[in-house]
């Protein structure tokens, strides 16, 4: 199953060994993200390290492991799609996630940002949905 992952799910996986991290390492999913996700993570680096109560080196190792499971899509690859999406949601920086969803023909976007649900064109998944898909891999979305 192809899933575009929002930065809030990566941050959650970095902060705590939780359901989010288990989903991220689940082989039933193929994760994609726009390249700007790395900047988003870096912007909150100090907060993540503090909340996770880990050292910088541990953060780097964990981040590296997580990004082994995410294919980063360059803005050059989805640039043309951005123009077609217009203002699909209020937070325009998040439009890149929708563009990547189209570009890779993903099944949906995994996020806990509720404003993603303001639009009806793309499927938005939360942890509970991802857990269900993981346990029912042969089912339709």
Give a label for each model feature:
Residues 1-33:
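Short, well-structured N-terminal submotif of metal-dependent ribonuclease cores
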Residues 10, 37, 97, 115-116:
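Alpha-helix capping/helix-boundary segments
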Residues 13-14, 40, 44, 119:
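Residues that scaffold the ATP/ADP-binding catalytic core of kinase and kinase-like folds
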Residues 17-20, 25, 45-47, 123-126:
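Short, glycine/charged-enriched secondary-structure capping and boundary segments
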Residues 26-28, 35-84:
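PIN-domain endoribonuclease scaffold, especially VapC-family toxins
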Residues 31, 52, 124-128:
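Short hydrophobic/aromatic-enriched beta-strand-loop microsegments
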Residues 71-108, 114:
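Active-site neighborhoods of divalent-metal-dependent phosphate/nucleic-acid chemistry enzymes
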Residues 102-141:
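Acidic, PIN/NYN-like endoribonuclease modules and their adjacent C-terminal/linker elements
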């Amino acid at each position: 199953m192809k899933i575009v992952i929002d930065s809030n799910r990566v941050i959650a996986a970095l902060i705590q060994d939780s359901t989010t991290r288990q989903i991220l390492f689940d082989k039933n999913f193929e994760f994609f993200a726009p390249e700007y996700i790395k900047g988003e993570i870096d912007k909150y680096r100090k907060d993540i390290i503090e909340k996770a109560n880990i050292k910088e080196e541990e953060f780097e190792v964990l981040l590296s492991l997580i990004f082994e499971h995410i294919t980063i899509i360059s803005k050059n690859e989805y640039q043309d799609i951005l123009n077609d999406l217009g203002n699909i949601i209020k937070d325009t920086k998040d439009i890149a996630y929708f563009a990547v969803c189209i570009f890779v023909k993903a099944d949906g976007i995994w996020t806990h940002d509720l404003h993603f649900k303001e639009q009806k064109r793309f499927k938005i998944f939360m942890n509970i949905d991802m857990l269900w898909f993981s346990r029912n891999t042969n089912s339709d979305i």
